Each structure stands twice: as structure tokens, then as C-alpha cells.
């Protein structure tokens, strides 16, 4: 169900969020 998907998304963001933000910041700077 959508709740399972939501939990997976939350876990993914918890793991990858900082990485993605760093990449976005680097892209914005360059």
C-alpha cells in the first residue's frame, strides 16, 4: 500500500538526503 511506499521513501531520504543536498549544492555553486 501507499503507507509502505511512504515508509520506504522516508528511509531512503534519511539515508540519501544529505548526499542529495550536497550534490545539489555543488551543482548550484558550479
From Swiss-Prot:
Organism: Neoponera commutata
Subcellular compartments: Secreted; Target cell membrane
Gene Ontology CC: extracellular region; membrane; other organism cell membrane
GO MF entries: toxin activity
GO biological process terms on file: defense response to bacterium
Family membership: Belongs to the ponericin-G family.
Function recorded in the entry: Membrane-perturbating peptide with multiple activities. It is insecticidal, since it induces contractile paralysis in insects (L.cuprina) during several hours and death after 24 hours. It shows a relatively strong and broad-spectrum antibacterial activity against both Gram-positive and Gram-negative bacteria (MIC<20 uM). It is also antiparasitic, since it potently inhibits the larval development of the major pathogenic nematode of ruminants (H.contortus, IC(50)=5.6 uM) and reduces the motility of adult males of the other nematode B.malayi.
Tissue expression remark: Expressed by the venom gland.
Pfam families found in the cross-reference section: Ponericin
Chief place of localization: secreted
The name this protein goes by in its record: M-poneritoxin-Nc3a
UniProt xrefs under InterPro entries: Poneritoxin
Keywords, comma-separated and alphabetical: Antibiotic, Antimicrobial, Membrane, Secreted, Target cell membrane, Target membrane, Toxin
Membrane-crossing residue ranges in chain numbering: none
Amino acid at each position: 500500500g501507499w503507507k509502505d511506499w511512504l515508509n520506504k521513501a522516508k528511509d531512503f531520504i534519511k539515508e540519501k538526503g544529505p548526499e542529495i543536498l550536497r550534490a545539489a549544492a555543488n551543482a548550484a555553486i558550479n
